[in-house]
């Protein structure tokens, strides 16, 4: 089983044209529909649109990836709808706790685009609603005042950070999603792929304790010198708020957070943040980032009638009307989306050749091992090679237990 995101998804988003808006909700929902998803702006928009149908209970939680496996394994499932991404869909698919959607798409998904249909082994298992990637965001006013060009490489990021630090214009030159666990692992995945590193050997044994792995960790540590010293608690919301409060000058942050920079209700830097491609590293040509999709799945452990009802509610949440009301909240794959300046960084990252996140069962195990093991290097407890060796050992144990190796 493989979960794949093609850069064609970004091309598809670029080519979408406006369509006619539908009514607020095409039917009156009389059954309770529960959803569990992340809590960023796009999910707020989608779940608010679903709620217009009535009887919708939406749980928005950035720890959704930890809760979903057990919640969807319950019988009946604790939720009808799940919000997922490339990697977070994998454990649900492997466990058989979400259902194929082919029949429901045929009956109620006429508005969906071909590039929204996420197929696993020929079956539609998820509906993609948006694409996402981490890319460079920077304070255009500070960069202009200091004569700094938009950094295209991580070496240029370090040089820019040093100049900004010397100028003393912000609390910290750089922000980073380095929170221990999933976020920190994703930072390594991005950087390691920028070094063109391979995660596994042919037999799915680990392959990260090498020159590329050490170099990736060393670059990550070099960047932390310009971050808030509490970077190991810094997730996407933390970095977003650092930007909005004028505390940092740049970060490689998720495209789904771009619109928040210009939200006048909570941001002090409206119009001052520019979005560009994720940097390359060490002379490479591929951005040190990964491409993602976010979308919707339907629980397996509910009745067919409840599944159909939940799917209808979900379709109301990702329709053209929702996009027209929330165009800037994401790089939508939905009919009616019109790309804006806040999408520029995501499109540039894709156009420059960023690769899809390599979602798979073994990668889920590797991601967990990375998230648990990298901090020991950053804090000085272990050398880079020792940390990578321990991560490989942790992955090997988990992979053998899971039958991957």
Question: Model regions: which residues?
Answer:
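Conserved N-terminal structural module of periplasmic/extracytoplasmic solute-binding proteins
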Residues: 6-9, 21-88, 232, 284, ...
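C-terminal capping/gating helix-and-loop segments adjacent to ligand/active sites or protein-protein/ligand interfaces
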Residues: 57, 119, 344-398
């Amino acid at each position: 089983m493989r979960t794949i995101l093609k850069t064609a998804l970004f091309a598809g988003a670029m080519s979408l044209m406006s369509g006619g808006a539908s009514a607020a909700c095409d039917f009156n929902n009389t059954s309770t529909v529960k959803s569990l998803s992340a809590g960023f702006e796009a999910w707020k928009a989608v779940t608010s649109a679903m709620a217009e149908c009535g009887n919708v209970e939406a749980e928005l939680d950035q720890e959704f990836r930890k809760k979903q496996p057990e919640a969807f394994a319950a019988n009946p499932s604790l939720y009808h709808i799940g919000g997922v991404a490339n990697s977070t869909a994998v454990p649900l698919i492997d466990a058989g706790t979400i259902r194929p959607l082919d029949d429901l798409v045929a009956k109620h998904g006429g508005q969906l685009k071909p590039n929204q249909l996420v197929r696993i082994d020929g079956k539609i298992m998820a509906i993609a609603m948006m694409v996402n990637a981490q890319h460079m965001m920077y304070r255009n006013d500070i960069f202009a005042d200091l004569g700094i060009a938009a950094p295209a490489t991580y070496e240029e990021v370090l040089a820019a950070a040093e100049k900004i630090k010397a100028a003393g214009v912000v609390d910290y030159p750089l922000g980073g999603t380095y929170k221990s666990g999933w976020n920190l692992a994703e930072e390594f995945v991005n950087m390691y792929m920028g070094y063109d590193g391979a995660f596994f050997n042919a037999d799915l044994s680990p392959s990260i304790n090498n020159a590329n792995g050490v170099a990736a960790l060393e670059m990550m540590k070099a960047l932390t010198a310009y971050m808030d010293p509490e970077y190991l608690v810094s997730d996407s919301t933390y970095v977003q708020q650092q930007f909005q409060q004028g505390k940092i000058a740049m970060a490689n942050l998720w495209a789904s957070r771009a619109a928040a920079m210009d939200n006048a209700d909570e941001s002090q830097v409206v119009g001052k943040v520019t979005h560009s491609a994720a940097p390359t590293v060490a002379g490479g040509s591929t951005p040190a980032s990964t491409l993602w999709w976010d979308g919707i799945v339907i629980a397996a452990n509910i009745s067919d009638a409840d599944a159909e009802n939940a799917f209808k509610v979900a379709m109301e949440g990702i329709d053209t009307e929702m996009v027209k009301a929330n165009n800037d909240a994401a790089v939508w794959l939905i009919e009616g989306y019109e790309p804006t300046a806040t999408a520029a960084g995501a499109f540039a990252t894709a156009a420059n050749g960023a690769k899809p996140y390599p979602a798979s069962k073994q990668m889920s195990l590797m991601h967990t091992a990375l998230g648990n093991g990298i901090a020991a290097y950053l804090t000085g407890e272990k050398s880079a090679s020792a940390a990578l060796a321990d991560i490989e050992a942790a992955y090997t144990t988990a992979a053998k237990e899971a039958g991957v190796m």
